[in-house]
Amino acid sequence: MGVALGAGLAVSIAGIGGGIGMGIAGGKAFEAIARQPEVGGDVRTLLFITLAFIETLTIYGLLIAFMLVGKA
C-alpha cells in the first residue's frame, strides 16, 4: 500500500506543479506579447521551449511512479 501511495503522490505532485508552472509561464508570456507585440515571435518560441522543459519534469514524476510500482 505504501508503494501505491508513493506512486500516486509522485504523479499528482508532478502534475500539479507542472500545471501551475505552465500556467504562470503562459500568462507571463502573453503579458509580454501584449506589452510589446513586435517581439511576439521570439517570446512564443521561448515559451514553447520552456513548456517542453516543464513537461519533461512532469514526465519524470510519472517515470518515478512506474519505477516504484515496478519494485512492488
Curated annotation (Swiss-Prot):
Superkingdom of this protein's organism: Bacteria
Reversibly protonated during proton transport (site feature) positions: E55
SUPFAM superfamilies found in the cross-reference section: F1F0 ATP synthase subunit C
Cellular component annotations (GO), alphabetically ordered: plasma membrane; proton-transporting ATP synthase complex; proton-transporting two-sector ATPase complex, proton-transporting domain
Residue ranges crossing the lipid bilayer per the database entry: 4-24, 46-66
Membrane-protein topology: Multi-pass membrane protein
KW Zinc (keyword) present: no
Keywords (A to Z) from UniProt: ATP synthesis, Cell membrane, CF(0), Hydrogen ion transport, Ion transport, Lipid-binding, Membrane, Transmembrane, Transmembrane helix, Transport
Protein location: Cell membrane
Molecular-function GO term, any one: lipid binding
Oligomeric and partner information: F-type ATPases have 2 components, F(1) - the catalytic core - and F(0) - the membrane proton channel. F(1) has five subunits: alpha(3), beta(3), gamma(1), delta(1), epsilon(1). F(0) has three main subunits: a(1), b(2) and c(10-14). The alpha and beta chains form an alternating ring which encloses part of the gamma chain. F(1) is attached to F(0) by a central stalk formed by the gamma and epsilon chains, while a peripheral stalk is formed by the delta and b chains.
Function description: F(1)F(0) ATP synthase produces ATP from ADP in the presence of a proton or sodium gradient. F-type ATPases consist of two structural domains, F(1) containing the extramembraneous catalytic core and F(0) containing the membrane proton channel, linked together by a central stalk and a peripheral stalk. During catalysis, ATP synthesis in the catalytic domain of F(1) is coupled via a rotary mechanism of the central stalk subunits to proton translocation. Key component of the F(0) channel; it plays a direct role in translocation across the membrane. A homomeric c-ring of between 10-14 subunits forms the central stalk rotor element with the F(1) delta and epsilon subunits.
Stored NCBIfam families: ATP_synt_c
Protein family per UniProt: Belongs to the ATPase C chain family.
Record's protein name: ATP synthase subunit c
Organism expressing this protein natively: Syntrophomonas wolfei subsp. wolfei (strain DSM 2245B / Goettingen)
